[in-house]
């Protein structure tokens, strides 16, 4: 299983860098910051499905 270290999130602002992550909700997040903020908002229910677009 792919994992991401989201310690230090959520962050108030994310860069526009595009390094896609596919979440367990089948949504593509544009980068680690966007993904980790969503993980923080989900109280840990969101996980990484795989690296890259969904």
Curated annotation (Swiss-Prot):
It holds the Pfam family Kazal_1. Disulfide bonds join 6-36, 14-33, 22-54. The record marks 16-17 as: Reactive bond 3. SMART domains: KAZAL. It is found in: Secreted. Glycans are attached at residue 43. Residues 4-54 form the Kazal-like domain. Its main location: secreted. The keyword tRNA-binding does not apply. Avian ovomucoid consists of three homologous, tandem Kazal family inhibitory domains. This is Ovomucoid.
